[in-house]
From Swiss-Prot:
One of its GO terms (cellular component) is cytoplasm. GO terms for biological process: diaminopimelate biosynthetic process; lysine biosynthetic process via diaminopimelate. Substrate binds at residues 104, 141. This is 2,3,4,5-tetrahydropyridine-2,6-dicarboxylate N-succinyltransferase. It catalyses: (S)-2,3,4,5-tetrahydrodipicolinate + succinyl-CoA + H2O = (S)-2-succinylamino-6-oxoheptanedioate + CoA. Its EC number is 2.3.1.117. The gene is dapD. InterPro entries: DapD_Trfase_Hexpep_rpt_fam, Hexapep, Hexapep_transf_CS, THP_succinylTrfase_dom1, THP_succinylTrfase_N_sf, Trimer_LpxA-like_sf.
Length: 275
């Protein structure tokens, strides 16, 4: 792995001079191998190590180099054609392979090569970009989008129209992460490398970026860039210092643990926000 990383890091420093026709065969092979490993879930753009999320920047570099070494080509899709540098993940899948990997893909869901879809995941008509990871047993609902390099945990439900932001550049920016057992309500957006902690419930129409104030009404604490585990979050507002107006905020109305979630439905949690 260290040799692969060294080749990618070195090539990235010379990326402006790399074209599909001029790329060194060793670099091409290293990039393609990295994308194949991403596609198979053997490596990830980010992973949790000792309780902290670690971003593997060299993997993001490989994704960016993948665009430089490929020409656009015609891709066959559901009833139409596409013209792009990244092939579709399931282009060469057979019925046997779908069964072996135990995933369900509903047309016209679009998944780019270099993303990983774990066992028992369900993709309704949705979009999953290169470098993304969708965990075991998760559902990506209708018109939801999983951006480049976004990390979706196990048993997550991304409801209809949800947007999970992608990030390739700037290189130092971290990916958006939805941890295990989260529920993201319809038409919500989580972007700019925000981390939603395990077991959280995000209500419909909540928008969270790095500058969004995430207000915990129980403690009065304001978070940025991270929703604490087990949070139930709704749209809200906070007054300005002068008191003349209010600005948007995401509001943590309560905290729940796994035991509570197993006994109480999502809708019940959201209906009882004044409890």
């Amino acid at each position: 792995m260290s040799d692969l990383q060294h080749i990618i890091d070195d090539a990235f420093e010379r990326r402006d001079s790399i074209t599909p026709n001029s790329v060194d065969p060793i670099v091409r092979e290293a990039v393609l191998q990295t994308i194949d490993m991403l596609d198979a879930g053997q490596i990830r753009v980010a992973e949790k190590i000792a309780g902290e999320w670690v971003v593997h920047q060299w993997v993001k570099k490989a994704v960016l180099l993948y665009f430089r070494i490929n020409d656009n080509a015609v891709l066959q899709g559901a009833g139409t054609q596409y013209y792009d540098k990244v092939p579709l993940k399931f282009a060469d899948y057979t019925p046997e392979r779908f069964k072996q990997e135990s995933i369900r893909v509903v047309p016209p869901a679009t998944v780019r090569k270099g993303s990983f879809i774990a066992r028992n995941a369900v993709l309704l008509p949705s979009y999953v970009n290169i470098g993304a990871y969708v965990g075991e047993g998760s559902m990506v609902d209708t018109w939801a989008t999983v951006g480049s390099c976004a990390q979706i945990g196990a048993n997550v439900h991304l409801s209809g129209g949800v947007g999970i932001g992608g990030v390739l550049e700037p290189l130092q920016a971290g990916p958006t992460i939805i941890e295990d057992n989260c529920f993201i309500g319809a038409r919500s957006e989580v972007v700019e490398g925000v981390i939603v902690g395990e077991g959280s419930v995000i209500s419909m129409g909540v928008f969270i970026g790095q500058s969004t104030r995430i207000y915990d009404r129980e403690t009065g604490e304001i978070h940025y860039g991270r929703v604490p585990p087990g949070s139930v979050v709704v749209s809200g507002s906070l007054p300005s210092k002068c008191g003349k107006y209010s600005l948007y905020a995401a509001v943590i109305v309560k905290k729940v643990d796994a035991k509570t979630r197993s006994k109480v439905g999502i809708n019940a949690l959201l209906r009882s926000i004044d409890d």
